[in-house]
Amino acid sequence: MLEKQDRFSRYDPGKFRRRFRVLMWIVIVSLSLLTSRIWYLQVVKGDELRSQSENNRVRIHEVKALRGIIRDIHGKAIVENQPSYDISVVPGAVKNVGDVIRVLEAIYGNQGMEFRRDVSVSEKNRPFIPFKLAKNVSWEELALVETHSLDLPGVVVDVVPVRKYLGGEMTAHVLGYVGEVSPEDLNGDQTGTLKPGDRIGKSGIEKYLDEYLRGENGGEYIEVNAVGRKVKTLRRVEPIPGHDVTLTIDAELQKVAWEAMDGKVGSVVAMDPRDGAIRVMVSRPAFDPNLFNKGMHPDAWKKLATDPMRPMENKALSGQYPPGSTFKIVVAAAGLGEGIITPETTFYCNGLFRLGNHEFKCWQKKGHGRINLHKAIVESCDVYFYNVGKMVGVDKLAEYARAFGFGAPTGVSLPGERCGLIPTGEWKLRKTGEPWRPGDTISISIGQG
């Protein structure tokens, strides 16, 4: 009892009040800090945090527009669309994209699947836009992703339309192919509508009419769960398909020309003489445009691009060759137009044409005998046109050649056309420093040289 009284007798009210004040200040400061932090998060960072929260719950999923169907002159489809199943990852939904790729590689084991790793730009600039890791995967490969979905947060399967070229190599150079936009494509985009991941025409009709064929993409606002899986669609904007295109090409005639060129290098162009419409345009060797749907490995592309037979080149447009005997029509027109010959003018062909000490042979070694213009054209007599070309002269031949459209673009609806060369005396002097010689005229009179 005395001990208890002794304890109370030592109690100091002033000391207690000081401790209480210190405790109150600690509480006040703590509450002030907490209040200011809440104010900062709610007011200063509120919009940003709400956006982050929304991005973690809502994804904007782009719905690709179908490209227009391409048909031949008879309405037969030669290019269609088909679904492609792509494996993508939402960079902002995972801690480390590299870890996700390693899990995928472990799942697929030795099946040869390759996944893109250049995700850095997407992670930084578009963290909630799916980034494609693999394109056009098979049903079996797709099933593995679905089976291991719990191990793959942020990984989604996109269904996108890709091109199906029904003729394969046969129409490759006319139609071209579609591929993913490159940095150069984005920099050169005048419309401002392209973005990373878009697919555009890279060559042929696909490139020439790309904006007409492409259409406008739509989109879905979808709610996702904690592992990035779709829960429901909140809103959908339907895509607008591209326009269909009908070509002048006849698919059946194209097939005939393609088979006739089997094992050969060169091109075939067939035009309708009634209106100049191109019914056939074949170039061999060629490439399969369907290979670009999956994304071509750099080694495979290098092999294709450096092939000495140039399968990527449309030889009907880009190849530059001597016109050969077709040029004899130009020589005949020049001779008639300048009054140098008439249809009844004859020359004697014994199989040779002599110019000084040089001999120029006719394809018919025994010669054609005495022939007029009509027979010279029918039998393609070289000697007849040697004579006419020499009399007309190179500069007049060049003038008539240009009137026929030689040396100028045809205006065909395909990219990559290269114009031919019409030689003149001035051109040779400028190019080689040597004067034009009569023998040069003899060679070009039959479309050679």
Question: What kind of region is each of these model predictions?
Answer:
Residues 1-298, 308, 320, 342, ...:
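Periplasmic/cell-envelope proteins involved in peptidoglycan metabolism and beta-lactam response
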Residues 2-10, 79, 224-234, 270-326, ...:
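Beta-lactam-recognizing serine transpeptidase/beta-lactamase-like catalytic domain environment
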